[in-house]
């Protein structure tokens, strides 16, 4: 997909990594209806692309995303405005649901402020990293809109109930270091190192077996709302599915062979456990 003015995102492929880049820097990468639909279409295509092992979401320029594009809000009566937000919310949530459903790991590379729905989209990714100049702002309270973009689902799961309530009710801005302390991001990198470090992480994710990553995502997402018995039963089902995959046969053969000891691709249990 090209990054010209006809599109609100670009998609780049390098070393098994697909990068979805929001390309509206003059609008602070605000989520237009077109941007959301293009992002959704890109995720659909990337899901079935076997050459892609990991997906990065990031913004062009100095901002990750400012959330809903308020310039698209119609000037009509309240009913028209409500219809507009209903449709935009459905687009937004379709993207959020796809980020959860896709087997491949997703990484939010937060290059600058993540505001409102932009914050919500970053929370919906499996991992998140940011530059040391990134900031995070719920913003819904300040513009008179109830929080959405899956924030009520992901935020308390990521930062805990008290912090989620504090953040949404006070609407204060978190800097990169505090976002890391709260668990909003996994890592903070200097702006100079950001792109190279994002590339390193994304390539590492892309090199891992997608089917196992999908099983991990499913269990982590579903396990928090299950009983212990249900969770462990589903784990058994996933283990059985994974050992029936050719990847396991390959790794088992490596484990049983002498070559395994010098392989960087397999765990040396003697080294880990202190055996001979």
Curated annotation (Swiss-Prot):
Belongs to the enoyl-CoA hydratase/isomerase family. The lineage of its organism: Bacteria, Bacillati, Actinomycetota, Actinomycetes, Micrococcales. It catalyses: 4-chlorobenzoyl-CoA + H2O = 4-hydroxybenzoyl-CoA + chloride + H(+). Keywords: Hydrolase. Optimum temperature is 45 degrees Celsius. Activity is lost after 5 minutes incubation at 60 degrees Celsius, but one-fifth of this activity is restored after cooling to 45 degrees Celsius. This is 4-chlorobenzoyl coenzyme A dehalogenase-2. The keyword Hydrolase applies. Optimum pH is 8.0 in MOPS buffer at 30 degrees Celsius, 7.5 in 0.1 M potassium phosphate buffer at 30 degrees Celsius, and 7.4 in 20 mM potassium phosphate/2 mM DTT buffer at 30 degrees Celsius. Retains full activity in MOPS buffer between pH 6.5 and 10.0. Is irreversibly damaged below pH 6.5 in MOPS buffer, enzyme treated at pH 6.0 in MOPS buffer only regains 40% of its original activity after re-equilibration at pH 7.2. When treated at pH 5.2 or 10.1 in 20 mM potassium phosphate/2 mM DTT buffer activity is lost completely, but is recovered within 17 minutes following readjustment to pH 7.4. Substrate binds at residues 66-71, 117, 261. Homotetramer. One of its GO terms (molecular function) is 4-chlorobenzoyl-CoA dehalogenase activity. One of its GO terms (biological process) is coenzyme A metabolic process. Dehalogenates 4-chlorobenzoyl-CoA, 4-iodobenzoyl-CoA, 4-bromobenzoyl-CoA and, at a slower rate, 4-fluorobenzoyl-CoA. Does not dehalogenate 2-chlorobenzoyl-CoA or 3-chlorobenzoyl-CoA. Pathway: Xenobiotic degradation; 4-chlorobenzoate degradation; 4-hydroxybenzoate from 4-chlorobenzoate: step 2/3. Its EC number is 3.8.1.7. The active site is at residues 93, 148. The gene is fcbB2. Signal peptide: none annotated. SUPFAM superfamilies: ClpP/crotonase. It comes from the Bacteria.
């Amino acid at each position: 997909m090209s990054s010209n003015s006809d599109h609100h995102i670009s998609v780049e492929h390098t070393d098994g990594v697909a990068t979805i880049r929001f390309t509206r820097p003059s609008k602070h990468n605000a989520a237009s209806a077109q941007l959301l639909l293009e992002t959704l279409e890109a995720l659909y295509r990337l899901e079935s692309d076997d050459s892609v092992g990991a997906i990065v979401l990031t913004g062009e320029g100095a901002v990750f995303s400012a959330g809903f594009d308020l310039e698209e809000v119609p000037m009509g009566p309240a009913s028209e405005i409500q219809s507009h937000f209903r449709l935009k919310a459905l687009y937004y949530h379709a993207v959020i649901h796809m980020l959860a459903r896709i087997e491949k790991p997703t990484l939010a590379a937060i290059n600058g402020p993540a505001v409102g729905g932009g914050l919500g989209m970053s929370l919906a990714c499996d991992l998140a990293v940011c530059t040391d100049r990134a900031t995070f702002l719920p913003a819904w309270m300040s513009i008179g809109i109830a929080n959405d973009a899956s924030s009520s689902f992901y935020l308390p799961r990521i930062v805990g109930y008290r912090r989620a309530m504090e953040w949404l009710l006070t609407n204060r801005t978190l800097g990169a270091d505090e976002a890391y302390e709260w668990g909003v991001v996994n890592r903070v990198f200097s702006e100079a190192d950001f792109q190279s470090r994002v590339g390193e992480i994304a390539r590492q994710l892309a090199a891992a077996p997608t089917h196992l990553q999908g099983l991990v995502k499913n269990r982590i997402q579903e396990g928090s709302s299950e009983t212990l018995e249900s969770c462990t039963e589903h784990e058994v089902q996933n283990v059985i599915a994974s050992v029936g995959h050719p990847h396991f046969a390959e790794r088992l053969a490596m484990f049983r062979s002498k070559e395994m000891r010098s392989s960087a691709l397999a765990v040396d249990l003697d080294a880990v456990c202190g055996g001979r």
